[in-house]
Amino acid sequence: RRWGSCTASGTLALNPDLIQAPVMCIRYVVLHELCHLVHHHHGKEFFALLGQVMPDWRRWKERLEKNG
């Protein structure tokens, strides 16, 4: 499922179903999309940045995937 997207100009779009998720899952999606403003891919650098801004991102990603 696609939870969010971010345009090159910085516009975020979030899946309306996300409102039912725990706030930390929402935070994960928003931070994930904002990291795409710096790295437009899912490479090593992208995940390093995501880990800096949200060290426990894997926990929230897994919870969202499991319960989303």
Model-flagged regions — what are they?
Residues 1-28, 37-68:
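Active-site-proximal or metal-binding-adjacent scaffold patches in catalytic folds
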